[in-house]
Curated annotation (Swiss-Prot):
One of the record's GO cellular component terms: ribonucleoprotein complex
Record region (Disordered): 49-78
Source organism per UniProt: Enterococcus faecalis (strain ATCC 700802 / V583)
Biased composition (Basic residues): 60-71
Signal sequence bounds: none
Cysteine disulfide links: none
HAMAP family: Ribosomal_uL4_B
Gene3D superfamilies xref list: 3.40.1370.10
Protein name, UniProt field: Large ribosomal subunit protein uL4
GO molecular function: rRNA binding; structural constituent of ribosome
Family: Belongs to the universal ribosomal protein uL4 family.
Length: 207
């Protein structure tokens, strides 16, 4: 069973917590993680690209010259694709690039990246992150107390609005709730700072 040190906000260690081995202690499946990242990045694409085909281009309703007798190649419209200013053939149209994996595969990818963070000692657990009001300066001090000076993903439990507001303006700090954390979020960060409650909620979802 993987054990992770449990810290207070002031940086002092307050024992250890034992994490679920089936979630935080598996052998990472790099292939599934790669596929999950590609899937998530594909869903982020807007897909609003568009061009005009010959039916959408303005004009071209009249035949430019008669069919026979001119010696020139026959033409039906000045908006045909071979003309300058004509429509585009097989151009991109608005579409959605998103697709989904089976739920078991998505969960395996999340378990893999979390297990990798634990194995590399890049998962920092805190008892809680409580603030009387949104204070960026105080959250910055918490990171200093925990010796976190790199790109970090902060995972909070639902309803901890003051902590979320305190952290969101800091550079190299991303904030998510336990029910919205994604594979791309975890992979993009060098360290993961999670509250004890958030870790419990993640275990409940992935168990």
């Amino acid at each position: 069973m993987p054990n992770v040190a449990l810290f207070k906000q002031d940086g002092t260690q307050n024992g250890e917590i034992t994490l679920n081995e089936e979630i935080f202690g598996i052998e990472p499946n790099e292939s599934v993680v790669y596929d999950a990242i590609i899937m998530q990045r594909a869903s982020l694409r807007q897909g609003t690209h568009a061009v005009k085909n010959r039916s959408a281009v303005r004009g071209g309703g009249r035949k430019p010259w008669r069919q026979k007798g001119t010696g020139r190649a026959r033409q039906g419209s000045i908006r045909s694709p071979q003309w300058r200013g004509g429509g585009v053939v097989f151009g991109p149209t608005p579409r959605s690039y998103s697709y989904k994996f089976p739920k078991k595969v998505r969960r395996l990818a999340m378990k893999s990246v979390l297990s990798d963070k634990v194995a590399e000692n890049n998962l920092v657990a805190v008892e809680g992150l409580s603030f009387d009001a949104p204070k960026t300066k105080e959250f910055k001090q918490v990171l200093a107390n925990l010796s976190i000076d790199t790109k970090v993903l902060v995972v909070l439990e639902n309803g901890n609005d003051f902590a979320a507001l305190s952290a969101r303006n800091l550079p190299n700090v991303s904030v998510v709730t336990s029910d919205n954390v994604s594979v791309l979020d975890v992979v993009s960060a060098n360290k993961v700072l999670a509250t004890q409650t958030a870790l419990t909620q993640i275990e409940e979802v992935l168990a």
